[in-house]
Amino acid sequence: MISSDAERSRVVFRDGDASYEATINLPGGYNIYNACSTMACGKAVGLDLQVVSKSLSAFACGFGRMEKFEIDNVPLRMILIKNPAGCNQVLNFLTEMTEPFTFAVCLSDRTQDGRDISWIWDVDIERLVQMGDLLDHVLLSGNRADEMAIRFQYAGLPMEKLEVVRDYLDLTKACVARKKPCYIMPTYTAMLSLRSTISKHFGFKAFWE
C-alpha cells in the first residue's frame, strides 16, 4: 500500500518482477483485500494484469457500499453491514480516523437482515468507544435501535454521546447538524429505507439509477 485515507487507497500489486499500481476508489482495508482477489482471479484466467489494475482504478461503489453523500457541505458515508466480521472491518477503518466524526448505526431485524441480532455482542464496539473525543457522537436508528443502545452502554460510551432517532429523515438531519463527517452503518433493510429517504428529500438518485 502506498497511501490510504478516508476516500481511497493507492496500492501496488506485484507479480514476480512486474508491478501494477492502482487507486482503489473506496476506503477501508477490506476493499484492498477485494482488489487483491480481483487481481488474483485476473491472473488465474489469463487476463492482462495492467488492464485489470486500470479497471480497478475506474471502479465506483455500489449503493450503500461505502457510498458517499454530501449534504450542506457535510460528508456522509453509508457502509452496509451484515455480520460481525464485516462490522469489525468497518470499525477497523473508523479507528484510523484522525479527525472527530459522527457515527450512526441503523439496526433492523427484518427477514432480509436476519432475525437474530445477538451478533452485535461479537462486534468490538469497545474499540470504537476507546477513541474518546474522536468519536464525537453516536446516533442510533432502526427497529432494534434500543438493543444497539444497550450494546454501546455496556461498551462504556458516555450517555451524553448517545442518541436514538427513530425517523430516518430526522436521523439524516441529525447527522448533518453535527457538522462533522458522518459514517452510517445500516443493516440491509435499514439501508434501503434510509437511502430512499436521502434520495427523496435531498435530491440524490435512487439506488437503481
Report the location of each language-model feature.
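Surface-exposed loop/turn and secondary-structure junction residues enriched for glycine/proline
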Residues: 5, 25-29, 33, 69, ...
